[in-house]
Amino acid sequence: MIDLIFPDGSARQYADGSTGRDVAASISKSLEKKALLIKLDGKLLDLDRPLTPDLLGGGNRFEIITRDSPDALEVIRHDTAHVLAEAVQELFPGTQVTIGPNVEDGFYYDFARDEPFSLDDLPKIEERMRQIVDRDEKIRREEVDRDAAIADFEAMGESYKAQIIRDLPASDTITVYHQGEKWKDLCRGPHLPSTKAVGKAFKLTKLAGAYWRGDQNNAQLQRIYGTSWATEADLEAHLKRIEEAERRDHRKLGKTMDLFHIQEEGKGMVFWHPKGWTLYLALEAYMRRRLDAAGYREVKTPQILDKSLWERSGHAEKFGHAMFMCESAEGEVLAVKPMNCPGHIQIFNVGQKSYRELPLRMAEFGACHRYEPSGAMHGIMRVRAFTQDDAHIFCREEQVTEESARFIELLRSVYSDLGMHLADTKFSTRPELRAGEDAVWDKAEAALSAAAEAAGETLVLQEGEGAFYGPKLEFSLKDAIGRVWQCGTLQLDFVLPERLDAEYVAEDGSKKRPVMLHRAILGSFERFIGILLENYAGHLPLWLAPVQVVVATITSDADDYAQRVAERLTSMGIRAEVDFRNEKINYKIREHSLAKVPVIAVVGRKEAENGEVALRRLGGEGQKVLSLEDAVRALTEEATPPDLARDRAVAAPAELAQA
């Protein structure tokens, strides 16, 4: 007999070999009909998998998974990928299947086929997929002999599957899943009971190229992407989100707002246009003020350093594949820096440091370069050249919790100023392969956890996902349409100071290694600007907008007045331009609205005579007529960055008291 413990804490006994379906049926017929999978000690398994003592992990925690469970969704997506593969092979005989995982919001499958798929093929494939769902093909797991499986897949013409099996560790159990009587795939599972359980809430979304095992030296494959959901309503909501995301695409906004471009001769390198660079500098100036106020000292380190430094730091071994290397005429092997931390330790190491000088907070807006494959790059969000809002805090062990908590408070404040808020904070603990003693890891993990709790953060645990040199916190934002972006990081490092010989004189006169906290808030300026553009759909807060006000004339006899208005705004720090063109005012308004200018100040003969401006807001209806000075006062206040606005609010009562 086997003992199972249910989520409510109750326990029942079942005969060896009972399945999840048997357990569901013993509870109720309705649950048996709804059941799709089981979860045993946290692991998802097929509903019809026999439950035996060797399968139970000892905890015997048992749960029946139905369609409305989040756990079911990833399996629904995986099964949809299998239905896609069967449909493709039915419609296009001779096509080989390779891999087909579920991914965020959907799935894909990579196919080996001489003739390329076209977008016109996708509706045909979708229709065949629906037919396969209607056929209610039973999905059955089978453990097979390794050599027999290789021979079987080779005989089927599935050389990629045979190669996957050959490369699996000898200790691995080889499992095949049958889908109906005619189709099968190599897979670990788990899977749903039948294709009918997949449902029809799916859609194929795009085609892409891929390489076998992600290596451009291998065969090129064709990838079909799709999305799959538990219900039609969920699918419809997702498609609307995609439509909205396309409308907000930072690449389109970058063009219509004239912010930046990327071209073939500089793949993954951003050409910032004047307006885009103005936005960049506004964000950089804000971050510089926030770091300065928080006690950071800004530094600048070289772009290119001798490879030997990267070998000592360990980066050449861990990140060598992503580093740009070059050789000088004198035979020096140099590397363009992929990150800033080794350079910061070089600055720390100049001169003897005392415990009294710690914590030492060192910041750099450091330009870094990392190789990204062409297919992986995406606008300014994933590039080869980027600038990090990077900083490293050198501190004593007993300062880690306080410094971490201070950083989290700063991070939250910055995100709030930028109109973004934390979605979650992930806590990644020691990986299997790691440096350092367990006792040191115990202290490090406890310190980060305590800091997060002190800052009021609820942590999402990611066991074994920490860096090899220390645990880390990852901070994710949720944007206006519900997408989550991982941006901020806080990593505790007790390895790099050892490797690069960083030390300070302790209170007792002994030499000790500082603890190093790697931290970033934005991550990179390029990516974060892309996130901001998409979050705001280009309608940035006034203080960040590259052009804050356009003064647009109705008739040419208001040109002189328009120029005076622009000069008055500019004198107060407002980024203003004048549109004197001989075009209708509605045309000008439409054009500047498409360029996402937040405020259009309309002036004509009447406004010139009265010393007024008619303010029209982006996305608003109508306009508000104000005197020039009232408009300047209101816009100046609104265009003040939030940190400066707070400083002025604090200073105002003190000034009044002195008066």
From Swiss-Prot:
It catalyses: tRNA(Thr) + L-threonine + ATP = L-threonyl-tRNA(Thr) + AMP + diphosphate + H(+). InterPro entries: aa-tRNA-synt_IIb (IPR002314), aa-tRNA-synth_II (IPR006195), aa-tRNA-synth_II/BPL/LPL (IPR045864), Anticodon-bd (IPR004154), Anticodon-bd_dom_sf (IPR036621), Beta-grasp_dom_sf (IPR012675), TGS (IPR004095), TGS-like (IPR012676). Its EC number is 6.1.1.3. Residues 637-659 are annotated as: Disordered. Residues 249-541 are annotated as: Catalytic. Residues 1-61 form the TGS domain. CDD domains: TGS_ThrRS, ThrRS_anticodon, ThrRS_core. The keyword Ribonucleoprotein does not apply. GO terms for biological process: threonyl-tRNA aminoacylation. Binds 1 zinc ion per subunit. Disulfide bonds: none annotated. Transmembrane segments: none annotated. GO terms for cellular component: cytoplasm. Catalyzes the attachment of threonine to tRNA(Thr) in a two-step reaction: L-threonine is first activated by ATP to form Thr-AMP and then transferred to the acceptor end of tRNA(Thr). Also edits incorrectly charged L-seryl-tRNA(Thr). NCBIfam families: thrS (TIGR00418). Homodimer. This is Threonine--tRNA ligase. It comes from Caulobacter sp. (strain K31). The gene is thrS.
